[in-house]
């Protein structure tokens, strides 16, 4: 310091250089806490800000390399702990702190970076349920992005071998921690999408510290998951660990083993489910078949035995005829009795006038009797005509008379309604309006073929 006691004139540059040397020699590394203000990060990649407290402030600079290594984004008003060295910016004669490390006060840098990135991606909609895709129930090809030597891949293989072995596994090996791991993971996700024909993808690793899992909190991984065309299941760490990848993925699994359990169903459980469904289907088919058989039997009886229906109509005609005969007889008997009575009364009265009056009355009664008999007979004839018309309308014989026939399969004589009931060599009986014929089936056509195929004999 003797230099300053002697009268030695220094230039501004020399003095500034001297002060700079003193600062850099005595303050190689200092830790300073304060509040960020006037933050500016131009295109050069360097970051400039002021660190202040209630009594003073100091200019700071963080060069591009150090700034890029930060896990969080500094903002004005944020209280931070800064590490760096003091120097002097000679053009302005201002001393400044060249920072190489920043840490938010009250919360770790990684945690701050996690919160900031989560807020950013949430605003962009990357976590929205609208983007979530359904995980296929029975995937055939599964892609896995993880370390080839870690516990995660061993756990996944163990679960797959235990639950269902008929799946194809495509592993894309990557580093899951350290510098460059995030980029490798993102590239692997893109590569598996380019491979194609994948049904689902598992992206993950085993447990670890926040620093160990940090690659899955990087923005590059989140965006790779979001643009993936293949549904992605994130399986990072243990059940209590949450990463940005978990929020972007279509589904989060607590562990890699849990992810394998989700994508691959148990073969034993599937077999039991198929057996149960098969049994239910068999029971349902049996019930429908029984109902169909009962209906066919009832219809067959009605068609194969028309005499029952005809007999019912014949009984009705006989009943009407007997009723008509009975009522006509009653009318005649009543008239005969009245004639006898009148004849007796007439025989007791000799005057010609009385005789003439009774003759006229007798004629009137005879005429009324004729009219009554005519009306009764007309009504009876009309009833018989209606019954006969109904009988002819429903009679299979009337249908047969128009050129149709009834085919019965022998020996059961069941009525054939479809060609699917017949097979070559079957014996059938064909009934016509007059007579019947025994035939042998040479060929049976499907229902659709019968409309276009040329007629063939059976």
Curated annotation (Swiss-Prot):
It is found in: Cytoplasm. CDD domains: ExoVII_LU_OBF (cd04489). Heterooligomer composed of large and small subunits. Signal peptide: none annotated. GO terms for cellular component: cytoplasm; exodeoxyribonuclease VII complex. It catalyses: Exonucleolytic cleavage in either 5'- to 3'- or 3'- to 5'-direction to yield nucleoside 5'-phosphates. It is an enzyme of class 3 (hydrolase). Bidirectionally degrades single-stranded DNA into large acid-insoluble oligonucleotides, which are then degraded further into small acid-soluble oligonucleotides. This is Exodeoxyribonuclease 7 large subunit. GO terms for molecular function: exodeoxyribonuclease VII activity; nucleic acid binding. Disulfide bonds: none annotated. It comes from Citrifermentans bemidjiense (strain ATCC BAA-1014 / DSM 16622 / JCM 12645 / Bem). Belongs to the XseA family. The keyword Cytoplasm applies. Its main location: cytoplasm. The gene is xseA. One of its GO terms (biological process) is DNA catabolic process. Keywords: Cytoplasm, Exonuclease, Hydrolase, Nuclease. HAMAP family: Exonuc_7_L. It holds the Pfam family Exonuc_VII_L. Its EC number is 3.1.11.6.
